[in-house]
UniProtKB/Swiss-Prot annotation:
Subunit text: G proteins are composed of 3 units, alpha, beta and gamma.
InterPro entries in the cross-refs: G-protein_beta_WD-40_rep, Gprotein_B, Guanine_nucleotide-bd_bsu, WD40/YVTN_repeat-like_dom_sf, WD40_repeat_CS, WD40_repeat_dom_sf, WD40_rpt
Physiological role: Guanine nucleotide-binding proteins (G proteins) are involved as a modulator or transducer in various transmembrane signaling systems. The beta and gamma chains are required for the GTPase activity, for replacement of GDP by GTP, and for G protein-effector interaction.
The protein's name: Guanine nucleotide-binding protein G(I)/G(S)/G(T) subunit beta-1
Family of the protein in this entry: Belongs to the WD repeat G protein beta family.
A Gene Ontology biological process term: signal transduction
Spans of repeat WD: 53-83, 95-125, 141-170, 182-212, 224-254, 268-298, 310-340
UniProt keyword annotations, A-Z: Repeat, Transducer, WD repeat
Lineage, top ranks: Eukaryota, Metazoa, Ecdysozoa, Arthropoda, Crustacea
Pfam family, any one: WD40_Gbeta
Gene: GBETA1
Organism: Homarus americanus
Key word Repeat present: yes
Source organism, top-level taxon: Eukaryota
Length: 340
């Protein structure tokens, strides 16, 4: 037996030891702990606004921190900033590359970012003196497509990429400050913790990881999914996060318990999940699916509480406002819908 085989066996043994230790530490399950809770009841949301203007598939959206404006990115090569109250377009930004996969709104509202198959994260300034929108910085450095980006503040942004890494950038200098390596597949999504000190990532190696932004270390790895993880989102209190995967399940992982707490699945659901988001309280988990629907889950009882049906194609992205008052879904049908 060669060294490689013995190392593989050793790694497998260690994995099993960790799995068993996690199991032994589990004194109750979420379903048992919440059995006495009242069910939420049926959640029925209506479409309040439809944002029309993109001419092709929408791939990504992100709410601004004012809970009014949002940015969306489409295959039509446009980044549009919308006023969700009036449905007006505040900015329509033509992109150099139309192969865009992600977009982000800075917490200050002064910048938006996007990227995709060009491997570059482009930062656009919305608050120029001339009143026009222009590229304020391009961040090249990833050797694979840009799958997700999120601003820490106006001068720092975290990106995830198909090159199996994530990166923290200094926007002013355009330099990569930290590279986060450890995934063994394309990193598809990231989510910043509420305190902005850590972030989680989901990847095509079917694992999620928790990273420390300050020192670049992987703090924890969460296995469990059986296929690519397409989406991750933090629980509002920062102690847990949810994932959505091509294995047709969403899962809830607890950071302090270091393991999976819950799985959200149904025999009738056989398609992958593209996007996930929590309500402000964390009581609801919203998930967008390849079958054109968005399911609403009771996050504590792991039961389906409702469905948002209104798109004519895959729901590719969704987000809940910071004030918790509305949900936006974006779809390959080229429309964004605002629900509450």
């Amino acid at each position: 037996m060669n060294d490689l085989d013995s190392l593989r066996q050793e790694a497998e043994r260690l994995k099993n030891t960790i799995r068993d230790a996690r199991k032994n530490a589990l004194d109750t399950t979420l379903v048992q702990a919440t059995a006495g809770m009242d069910p939420i009841g049926r959640i029925q949301m209506r479409t309040r606004r439809t944002l029309r203007g993109h001419l092709a598939k929408i791939y990504a959206m992100h709410w601004g921190s004012d809970s009014r404006n949002l940015v969306s990115a489409s295959q039509d090569g446009k980044l549009i900033v919308w006023d969700s109250y009036t449905t007006n377009k505040v900015h329509a930004i033509p992109l150099r590359s139309s192969w865009v996969m992600t977009c982000a709104y800075a917490p200050s509202g002064s910048y938006v970012a996007c990227g995709g198959l060009d491997n570059i994260c482009s930062i656009y300034s919305l608050k120029t003196r001339e009143g026009n929108v222009r590229v304020s910085r391009e961040l090249p450095g990833h050797t694979g497509y840009l799958s997700c980006c999120r601003f820490v503040d106006d001068n720092q942004i975290v990106t995830s990429s198909g090159d199996m890494t994530c990166a923290l950038w200094d926007i002013e200098t355009g330099q990569q400050c930290t590279q986060f390596t450890g995934h063994t597949g394309d990193v598809m999504s990231l989510s910043l913790s509420p305190n902005m000190r850590t972030f989680t990532s989901g990847a095509c190696d079917a694992s999620a990881k928790l990273w420390d932004i300050r020192d670049g270390m992987c703090r924890q790895t969460f296995p469990g999914h059986e296929s690519d993880i397409n989406a991750v989102t933090f629980f509002p209190n920062g102690h847990a996060f949810a994932t959505g995967s091509d294995d047709a399940t969403c899962r809830l992982f607890d950071i302090r318990a270091d393991q999976e707490l819950a799985m959200y699945s149904h025999d009738n659901i056989i398609c992958g999940i593209t996007s996930v988001a929590f309500s402000k309280s964390g009581k609801l988990l919203l998930a967008g699916y390849d079958d054109f629907n968005c399911n609403v889950w009771d996050s504590m009882r792991t039961e389906r509480a409702g469905v948002l049906a209104g798109h004519d194609n895959r729901v590719s992205c969704l987000g809940v406002t910071e004030d918790g008052m509305a949900v936006a879904t974006g779809s390959w049908d080229s429309f964004l819908k605002i629900w509450n």
